[in-house]
């Protein structure tokens, strides 16, 4: 599975490692992803999502039902 947050859409970005001598080499910055299960009361089932730490905070703020509706509106299957 890809390294993309299902809630916020955060994904890997490209940057540089910078040495003390200021040499730069390409590297990847990965989002802080976690595979989490959420209980959805309205559907009476568990939903498994790959979310970043920011995505977890969005779920805490808006609620899992609103977040799932947003994900489904984008066309993702949950």
Curated annotation (Swiss-Prot):
Gene3D superfamilies found in the cross-reference section: Ribosomal protein L28/L24
One Gene Ontology cellular component annotation held by this UniProt entry: cytosolic large ribosomal subunit
Keywords: Ribonucleoprotein, Ribosomal protein
MF-aspect GO terms: structural constituent of ribosome
GO BP field: translation
Alphabetized Pfam families for the sequence: Ribosomal_L28
Keyword field contains DNA-binding: no
Membrane-spanning parts: none
HAMAP family from the UniProt entry: Ribosomal_bL28
Family note: Belongs to the bacterial ribosomal protein bL28 family.
Protein's name according to its UniProt entry: Large ribosomal subunit protein bL28
Organism expressing this protein natively: Methylococcus capsulatus (strain ATCC 33009 / NCIMB 11132 / Bath)
């Amino acid at each position: 599975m890809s390294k993309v947050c299902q809630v916020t859409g955060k994904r890997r970005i490209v940057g540089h490692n910078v040495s003390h001598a200021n040499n730069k080499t390409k590297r990847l910055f990965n989002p802080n992803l976690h595979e989490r299960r959420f209980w959805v009361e309205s559907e009476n089932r568990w939903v498994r999502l790959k979310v970043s730490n920011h995505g977890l905070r969005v779920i805490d703020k808006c609620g899992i039902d609103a977040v799932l509706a947003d994900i489904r509106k984008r066309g993702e299957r949950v």
